[in-house]
């Protein structure tokens, strides 16, 4: 039985063949997904999702709520705010 830390499915399991011919299980972190809008569930435009070592202020567009909401949701919210 694996260690208690490896029993959960938060780490993905990869079968690796060793030089001695045995097959062992390695545990790796799962790949991160593309950033998505919480309202429309569309991928966020303008986000550099491949560069995770930089902060969100460098990766995200500089518009209001950039990197949080999609452009469609932002346009709708701005229209509602202006109209009253």
UniProtKB/Swiss-Prot annotation:
GO terms for molecular function: structural constituent of ribosome. The keyword Transcription regulation does not apply. InterPro entries: Ribosomal_eL34, Ribosomal_eL34_CS, Ribosomal_L34e_arc-type. PROSITE patterns: RIBOSOMAL_L34E. Keywords: Ribonucleoprotein, Ribosomal protein. Gene3D superfamilies: 6.20.370.70. GO terms for biological process: translation. It holds the Pfam family Ribosomal_L34e. GO terms for cellular component: ribonucleoprotein complex; ribosome. Belongs to the eukaryotic ribosomal protein eL34 family. This is Large ribosomal subunit protein eL34. The lineage of its organism: Archaea, Thermoproteota, Thermoprotei, Thermoproteales, Thermoproteaceae. The gene is rpl34e.
């Amino acid at each position: 039985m694996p260690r208690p830390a490896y029993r959960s499915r938060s780490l993905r399991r990869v079968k690796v063949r060793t030089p001695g011919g045995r097959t062992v299980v390695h545990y790796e972190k799962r790949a991160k997904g593309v950033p998505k809008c919480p309202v429309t569930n569309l991928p966020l435009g303008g986000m550099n999702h491949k560069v995770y070592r930089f902060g969100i202020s460098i990766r995200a567009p500089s518009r209001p709520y950039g990197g949080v909401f999609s452009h469609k949701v932002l346009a709708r919210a701005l229209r509602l705010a202006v109209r009253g």
